[in-house]
Design a protein with these regions (language model features):
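Cytoplasmic membrane-interface "Motif A"-like loop-to-helix N-cap segments
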Residues: 67-83
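A membrane-interface helix-boundary motif in multi-pass transporters
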Residues: 39-42, 75-78, 158-177
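Hydrophobic core of transmembrane alpha-helices in multi-pass small-molecule transporters
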Residues: 101-116
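Conserved glycine-rich helix-kink/hinge and helix-boundary motifs of the Major Facilitator Superfamily
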Residues: 11, 44, 48, 81, ...
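Interfacial helix-cap and linker-helix signal at transmembrane-aqueous boundaries
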Residues: 32-33, 64-65, 69, 156-165
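Multi-pass alpha-helical transporter architecture, strongest
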Residues: 93-97, 171-205
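A late C-terminal transmembrane helix in Major Facilitator Superfamily
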Residues: 58, 126-164
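Extracytoplasmic gate region of multi-pass secondary transporters
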Residues: 4-61, 114-122, 149-154
């Protein structure tokens, strides 16, 4: 697992992208309370709608990845890169705008594709690892998502918001998606090489050595 550059890059890229999605999910109720003057109940409901958008988007982006990656698996990597750049664009524009309906709409659109990398990342790990280690591979992906994304994101943005304010911290947050896109691009550059190596590793154990062939002939004789 850990000798494949594409797999390691997928872990890191997926984690960094969840840095963005996880941060918005955690801090959005507080953001709505501070900058929209919403009470806790209303902010919680609206934040839940945004989370729902990200959940639906994750499924639809995964379906799109399956559709376009059927005959060309590395297209899934390209889609993951597109999701990173798209979410960065939408969220950057959203948090550059003043509070209002337009901003909320753009946040929903950004979150719709922000978690869209979940599907392609899982598919890439499945394609690049042997069946015998799939459980370990997916557990490591989950660890990377939690460590680099869902845990680290809210922590860093929270610390940053104490210094420059939550709104300004949110303005910087989407830039992490650019890092995620760059890491996925690195994975794409090594994807075919790692696939070929995995195929060789699967075929070679099934090949009989000349010594085994001679031994069988002697046994038959």
């Amino acid at each position: 697992i850990y000798s494949s550059r594409s797999v390691i890059a997928t872990y890191i890229g997926s984690g960094f992208q969840l840095f963005v999605g996880g941060t918005v999910i955690v801090w959005m109720p507080s953001y709505l309370n501070r900058y929209y003057g919403m009470n806790t109940d209303t902010a919680g409901v609206l934040a839940a709608v945004i989370v729902l958008c990200s959940a639906v988007g994750s499924i639809l982006c995964g379906m799109l990845s399956d559709r376009f990656g059927q005959n060309c698996p590395d297209r899934k990597v390209s889609l993951a890169i597109s999701y990173c750049i798209g979410s960065c664009l939408f969220l950057s524009i959203a948090f550059a705008m003043p509070a209002g309906k337009s901003q909320l709409l753009l946040i929903c659109m950004g979150m719709f594709i922000a978690l869209g990398t979940n599907g392609p990342s899982s598919a890439m790990v499945a394609n690049l690892t042997h069946n015998s280690v799939h459980s370990t591979a997916f557990a490591t992906l989950t660890l990377a998502n939690n460590l680099l994304g869902l845990a680290l994101g809210p922590l860093i943005i929270g610390k940053l918001s104490d210094v420059i304010g939550l709104h300004h911290a949110f303005q910087l947050m989407p830039l992490v998606s650019i890092i995620a896109a760059a890491v996925f691009l690195y994975a794409k550059n090594h994807y075919h090489q790692d696939i070929a190596r995995l195929t060789d590793q699967a075929v070679l154990p099934n090949l009989e050595s000349p010594v085994d062939v001679m031994r069988k002939k002697n046994d038959d004789a």
